[in-house]
Regions:
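Bacterial N-terminal signal peptides that target proteins for export
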Residues: 5, 11-28
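Bacterial N-terminal signal peptides
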Residues: 27-37
Length: 441
C-alpha cells in the first residue's frame, strides 16, 4: 500500500512504513522485473560428462601471466603464457605429449633481443595441426615517460608443431609510439587468420577497435582496418567466425555519459569490411573508467553466436551474462545471468562452443581471501545450464577454455604457489547433446 511519500506494509501492529532498506529492495525487485533478462535456468547439479585428471606444470619464476589454451583434433593441449625471471621477460609455448597428458618442454617464442611488454592478459593462441600462431606485445623501442605503455603488436608462427618459431612479424601498420594491445586471434575454416586489437593511432581520448588478416599462414599481414572508435581502452577484444564464413568481433564500447556496453560487429565478406556494431546486453552500465574485463564468443554448427561478458548494469551488481544471436549478429536474445554466489565477485568469463551446441563457460569467483575457478555447462544450446561447479583446489585465477571439433573441451588456469606458479589443465568430455545443432544452410 502506498501513502504520499511512504510505502506501507502490513505488520502485527497494523500498517506501518516500510524501512529504507526494504524500500530499496522493493525498488530493485521492480526494476529487475522490467529488465530484458532471463532468470537462470539451471539443470541438475550433476555434471553431464567426465572431467579428466588435472595436469599441473610448475613454473619457478618471479611472475607469470596466462595461460592461453588450445586443444588439437587428437586431444593434445597447447599452452601459451608470459613469464619473468631474473629481469628477463619471455613469451612461452608448450604442447602436450599425449592427449590430455603432461605438457612437453616449453619453447621460448620471442628472440632474446625482443622484450615483451608486460601486460595483464596472456598471449593469444591458435593451434591447427602443426601450425601454431601467437600474438603478443613488444615493448616499443621508442617508448617515452609520456608514453610508457607504447607497444607494437607482433605475430609469431611455427609450422613444426611449436618446436621452433619464425621471427615475429608486425601486425600494426602505423609507426606511432602508442599502445597496440588487448588483441585476439582466430583462424577460420578456410585458413584465414583474423586479428583484432585496441589501437590509439588517431590520438583521440578513446582508442579504436582495429582488425587485420593473414592469408598466407602468418607470413604477412593485410592492411589494418578500423572497425569502430570510442573503444574502452583496456577490455580485451574477441574474434571468431561461423560455419558460413561470417566473422565477428566483440569489444566494450563507450557511449555518451560513460555508458559501457559489450558490442559485436560482423563481417559478411570474410573480414574485409565490417558493419556497425550491435549492443548485446543493453546493460546501461555507467562507469567512468576501464573495467579490464573482456567478452568471449563462440559459434555452433547451426550458426548460433554465443557471447559471455561481465557487467554491473544499472544496479551496480557484478554479474556474468550469456546471450545468443540466431540472425548472424543482427539481434541478441535476452541475457541470462550465470553466477549465483552472493558472497563473491565474478570475473574473467570465457566460453567455448562445440559444433553440436554444447557450451562450457568458465570464470573466476573472488572473495576477500579466496579466489576460485568455476564452470557452468549447457548441453542444449544454452537453454539450461548446470549449477556453477568449483574446479580449483588452491587460490587460482585467469581461467580459459577451448574445444576441438570432436567436442573435447580443454580447461586451464593459473594457480598461486610458492616459490613459483603453477598452470593447471584438465579436459572435459560432455554427454551427447539431446538436440544437436544442425548444419547451417
Amino acid at each position: 500500500m502506498f501513502q504520499r511519500g511512504k510505502v506501507m506494509i502490513q505488520s502485527r501492529r497494523g500498517m506501518v512504513p516500510m524501512s529504507r532498506p526494504g524500500r530499496r529492495a522493493l525498488c530493485a525487485g521492480l526494476v529487475l522485473g522490467l529488465l530484458p533478462m532471463i532468470q537462470p535456468a539451471f539443470a541438475e547439479t550433476a555434471l553431464p560428462g567426465e572431467l579428466g585428471p588435472k595436469v599441473v606444470t610448475e613454473h619457478k619464476v618471479k611472475s607469470l601471466v596466462g595461460p592461453s589454451v588450445q586443444i588439437d583434433e587428437a586431444g593434445a593441449l597447447s599452452l601459451a603464457w608470459m613469464e619473468e625471471d631474473k629481469e628477463v621477460r619471455s613469451v612461452m609455448y608448450a604442447r602436450g605429449t599425449e592427449p590430455g597428458g603432461p605438457m612437453g618442454a616449453p619453447v621460448r617464442i620471442n628472440r632474446p633481443e625482443d622484450v615483451p611488454y608486460w601486460r595483464q592478459e596472456a598471449p593469444a593462441l591458435v593451434v591447427q595441426g602443426d601450425d601454431v600462431f601467437v600474438t603478443w606485445g613488444l615493448a616499443h623501442p621508442k617508448a617515452t615517460p609520456q608514453q610508457p605503455f607504447a607497444t607494437e603488436l607482433r605475430l609469431s608462427r611455427s609450422i613444426d608443431g611449436g618446436k621452433t618459431f619464425h621471427p615475429s612479424v608486425g601486425v600494426n601498420d602505423d609507426p606511432g609510439v602508442i599502445q597496440h594491445t588487448f588483441d585476439a586471434l582466430h583462424r577460420d575454416a578456410d585458413g584465414r587468420l583474423h586479428l583484432s586489437w585496441i589501437d590509439g593511432r588517431e590520438g583521440k581520448k578513446e582508442p579504436g577497435t582495429y582488425v587485420a588478416r593473414s592469408l598466407d599462414r602468418g607470413v604477412t599481414i593485410t592492411r589494418n582496418l578500423k572497425v569502430d572508435e570510442g573503444t574502452c581502452v583496456c577490455c580485451r577484444t574477441a574474434v571468431t567466425s561461423g560455419p558460413d564464413g561470417m566473422v565477428y568481433v566483440a569489444w566494450r564500447k563507450i557511449f555518451e555519459g560513460s555508458v559501457r556496453e559489450t558490442v559485436v560487429a560482423r563481417s559478411t565478406d570474410h573480414g574485409e569490411t565490417f558493419e556497425p556494431p550491435v549492443i548485446v546486453g543493453h546493460d546501461k552500465w555507467v562507469f567512468p573508467a576501464c573495467p579490464h574485463r573482456p567478452a568471449s564468443m563462440g559459434v555452433d554448427r547451426q550458426g548460433r553466436l554465443y557471447v559471455v561478458w561481465y557487467t554491473e548494469g544499472t544496479d551496480e551488481i557484478p554479474a556474468v551474462y550469456v546471450a545468443y544471436s540466431d540472425d548472424r549478429g543482427r539481434t541478441f536474445s535476452p541475457k541470462r545471468q550465470l553466477n549465483v554466489s552472493r558472497n563473491t565477485f565474478p570475473d574473467h568469463p570465457q566460453i567455448a562452443v562445440d559444433p553440436e551446441g554444447r557450451l562450457v563457460v568458465i570464470w573466476e569467483e573472488q572473495g576477500p581471501v579466496k579466489r576460485d575457478v568455476v564452470m557452468s555447462v549447457s548441453t542444449d544450446r544454452g537453454a539450461a545450464f548446470t549449477t556453477p561447479r568449483k574446479l580449483n583446489e588452491r587460490k587460482s585465477q585467469t581461467p580459459v577454455v577451448a574445444v576441438n571439433r570432436q567436442g573435447v573441451f580443454a580447461l586451464a588456469w593459473m594457480e598461486h604457489a610458492m616459490p613459483g606458479h603453477k598452470i593447471v589443465t584438465q579436459t572435459l568430455r560432455l554427454s551427447p547433446a539431446p538436440v544437436a545443432a544442425q548444419a547451417v544452410q
